[in-house]
Amino acid sequence: MSGDTCLTAVCPASGAKPKTYSFKGGCLGNKYIRLNVGGCLYYTTVQVLTRHDTMLKAMFSGRMEVLTDKEGWILIDRCGKHFGSILNYLRDDTIALPKSRHEIKELMAEAKYYLIQGLVDKCQTALQDTNDTYEAVCNIPIITSPKEEEKLIESSAKPVVKLLYNRSNNKYSYTSNSDDHLLKNIELFDKLSLRFNGRVLFIKDVIGDEICCWSFYGQGRKLAEVCCTSIVYATEKKQTKVEFPEARIYEETLNVLLYETPRVPDNSLLEATSRIRSQASHSEDDDGFELRDRVRRIHVKRYSTYDDRQLGHQSAYRD
């Protein structure tokens, strides 16, 4: 055993309650003493316990009476959970405070009992710092893998709006307005996340295969997708065009707000947001099957080609 202080904490064996004897702390002649603090056993030195002007100094300098059992353990009727930290502070005036506010409060209560004002001040400062810590109101996860995306969506109790944008996916040159439209999509995503952050989980995907695409999820399932890119021909040269379908994005965002309720299947809710043009002759069971298994996907496309499709063609299909 070396050093000024040797500290251990062990749990004593269960058995009969030890008898205690009273004597004066000033009679302690050994350098090392044994402490039983609430059932936890510690070895330390009188020098450490009397280094600061505390209740422990009064106990072990003869000013207060202490109790020992028949085996020589000095008894202190307090919780021993944080006594090791208290001894560390008494030894070198430093301490690694617990991360939990609850445990810091426990340690501060023990420090107040032993009249260790320096440790009380450190605990109060730590508690004040945690109160002053600002937690971000709007947190937007950035997807790092498809597996992470799947877990986020499945575990979210809120509807989910995802914006995938990855400008490097383009094989061709962009049209003149594409960069501006891509920026507008990102700006709209930021505005929506600030407006609905408490009701909708907004996530960003910068590793996907699309250039700019919105996805909308409710109760763990994909409800709609708005793809904002298309390939156009200009002077016999392919170009990538990025659109900004603002009205459609607002509409789909408002639709997912209907899915803030717990995850209970609701065919009427699915029917109201899926926009499936079912024939009147379909049975209710067939309608329910189609509503659950279809995802609305809207691709805003503009064509200027040499085929028979007209300029301004917009296709909307489901799969």
From Swiss-Prot:
Entry annotated with the keyword Nucleus: yes
Q: Could you tell me one molecular function GO term of this UniProt entry?
A: small GTPase binding
Q: Which SUPFAM superfamilies match?
A: POZ domain
InterPro entries xrefs: BACURD1-3, BTB/POZ_dom, SKP1/BTB/POZ_sf, T1-type_BTB
| Locations listed in the record | Cytoplasm; Nucleus; Endosome
Q: Which UniProt keywords apply?
A: Cytoplasm, Endosome, Nucleus, Ubl conjugation pathway
Q: Which GO terms describe its biological process?
A: cell migration; immune response; negative regulation of Rho protein signal transduction; proteasome-mediated ubiquitin-dependent protein catabolic process; protein homooligomerization; protein ubiquitination; stress fiber assembly
Q: Where are the transmembrane segments?
A: none
Please list the residue ranges annotated as the BTB domain: 31-99
**Gene Ontology CC terms:** Cul3-RING ubiquitin ligase complex; cytoplasm; endosome; nucleus
Main subcellular location of this protein, as a coarse class: cytoplasm
Its pathway is: Protein modification; protein ubiquitination
Indicate the family of this protein: Belongs to the BACURD family.
| Task of the protein | Substrate-specific adapter of a BCR (BTB-CUL3-RBX1) E3 ubiquitin-protein ligase complex involved in regulation of cytoskeleton structure. The BCR(TNFAIP1) E3 ubiquitin ligase complex mediates the ubiquitination of target proteins, leading to their degradation by the proteasome.
**Quaternary structure note:** Component of the BCR(TNFAIP1) E3 ubiquitin ligase complex, at least composed of cul3, tnfaip1/bacurd2 and rbx1.
The protein depicted here goes by the name: BTB/POZ domain-containing adapter for CUL3-mediated RhoA degradation protein 2
> From what organism does this protein derive?
Xenopus laevis (African clawed frog)
Q: Which gene encodes it?
A: tnfaip1
